[in-house]
Amino acid sequence: MSDCAVLLITPPFTQLNTPYPATACLKGYLDTLGIKTAQTDLGLEVILRLFSENGLLEMFRVAEICPVSMNPEFRRIFVLREEYISTVDRAVAYLQGREQTLAHLICDGNFLPAGNRMPEEEDMEWAFGTMGLQDKARHLVTLYLEDIADFITGVIDPHFGFSRYAERLGRSASSFDELYAELHKPSTYIDRLMFSVLQEKIEQCKPGWMMLSVPFPGNLYSALHCGEFIKNNYPDIRVEMGGGFASTELRQLSDARVFEYVDFITLDDGETPLRQLLAGDEKNYVRTYICRNGKVCYLNNTEIPDVPMRDRGVPDYTGLPLDKYLSVIEIANPMHALWSNGRWNKLTLAHGCYWGKCAFCDGSLDYIGRYEPLTAVEIADCMEEMICRTGERGFHFVDEAAPPMLLKELALEILKRRMTVVWWTNVRFEKSYTLDLCRLLKQSGCIAVSGGLEVASDRLLKLINKGVSLEQVSQVTDHFTSAGIMVHAYLMYGFPSETAQETIDSLEVVRQLFLNGLVQSAFWHRFALTAHSPVGCHPEKYTIRITEKPFGGFARNDIDFEDIAGADHDIFGEGLRKSLYNYMRGAGFDLPLQKWFDEPVPKTLIPPAYIVRFLAEEQDNVQRDGHKRCYYLLPVLPEVRYFDRNKKGKSIPVAEFLFHFRDGDSRFQLKAGWGKWLEDLLSRLSDKNGKTVTLKDVESEFKACHFGSFDQFMTTPLWRSLRENGLYLL
């Protein structure tokens, strides 16, 4: 009898700063069934063992006998190995939030040995300034570790990487041959570290099942190595593999050799398949591959429904060393820094994407195509429980695109409960994000959003079926930025039929977005054709020709293709990267776009004030929509004092309002009759459980009291001040 029914494992390597959420979500669900589970982030455990005094000592011993000739950069690290060995424990401790006083030594350059990645002082001053001592030190320690990682990759193990391991072998490996051959090679130093940690976990937990969550191609090699180790040393333990990689890449699996490493492979959401596996009745297996008589069989009892989102329990991080994760800053990109620095509770607001129509996205797969939201109350309950369990108040909502109306309800629920949280998420830059909604999200704790601008061309946005326009994107990013929320834009180039002119015009749009402060962070991605996207399913609609080789029986997702109508985009990548790097620094806006490219490119056809014009033309339509509900969401109501004021010998009843806004106090005086109405109105609007009051209702009340023109009232300093400080129309 095993002490633990299931050991959930995230194999090396994923993020260093926070756990990948899959095992915590599965543990939360299995807990509701009374199934005893344990979990481990094997990647973090291996990193901590490797980047330690003993780990580096052994690593350099291995390097000494390696037949690889070292280049000058690696030779320098090897010669300075005592410096690295003596500093690594404190460097790691700094990234874990301990030893913070070391920041001064690190930034002065008197503590860490300097390797090839150490940046120019000018770049450091731009990225962190004079006030960002802790972040600057964090960046330098990250580069120090990356120098060591480069050494490991060049001398010890070519597959090593902080957030991926042998990623090339797993990325759309149509045939299993190369990966199979690599798995049969002698174990590397990193492999042996992984096996050592895995053995300790197994001896500690004594599980009956080991379930490997493989989110990315960079986790596949190590996952299969783990499976092999289990089968060779613990043959009674059954091994299952699932996660994002299997769900996207292995939907046509026919090569039985993979079952030399695992017993089962499951697809899509893991809750139901795992529950059915543990029940043991093969005829009730759900979305599960097995190997029977040397043949791959797919078992899927479609009569068994998936577990509803509300019944999946709360993600449970028990067993993961939350205080041991490393907050790193790899590159000076604001959103990437947010992604990798700090520990975030990861949570999903809704299963699938509420839009689900983008031509490049895997809309035919369950994780995108089946939309099932939680309620705001359910999400807030989950957040409160996670805060209690982890002690962390930061949340990353990992939805493909968070539904705006659900975000609105969640923000109201957070404010209603007076929760103190910080959160960020992915969005679509759609018209629902009014300035009022963005201010509400900011007040509830939102600090950043990322969204897909993709190809900044209205023709291509329409072809992609993005459901947004450049005008809309400009106005919505302005709303987020005006509310104090950082905006990161996902950018794409090389979409089918995209011309060189459109790529350059897209860059000009991006330049203007940065120039006008609408976007603070961005990243260019080269379009990749995937098998499960509308483009991959219907290539004839997008002027492309599929050129992939015959399927080899293992993985299929990224597809080779030829763009018949579009430009050759190989020449654009470096120029797009360089220009964006400068725009994020606030530099290079005056340079002609040609300066960023080595090859001749077309001149842009976008007018210089293209984006500014969109902002100038925007109307405050929210204030004209009488059906919008009014909320007054300041923590306290104003203090009101009534008195008589003498004016030209006459006594006039007056109301004085003292508002305690977040940025200071403001006083307003108005007629006593108006004051009584406004005092009552703000009281009603601040009651989140009270009767709905729309802007039309407010206007009707105003007119019924014979106060005059409501349109004129909405132009007064009092109304404008209220609108900027907590009176939202939603």
Question: Which residues fall in each region the model found?
Answer:
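N-terminal [4Fe-4S]-dependent radical SAM core
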Residues: 179-182, 296-346, 647-652, 662-668, ...
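Radical SAM enzyme core and accessory elements
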Residues: 2-11, 31-32, 46-164, 179-183, ...
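Catalytic cores of alpha/beta
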Residues: 253, 437, 497-512
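Canonical Radical SAM [4Fe-4S] cluster-binding loop centered on the CxxxCxxC motif
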Residues: 339-377
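Conserved SAM/AdoMet-binding glycine-rich loop
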Residues: 6-14, 209, 236-240, 248, ...
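Glycine-rich beta-alpha loop elements in corrinoid/cobalamin-binding modules
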Residues: 13-16, 21-55, 76, 83-86, ...
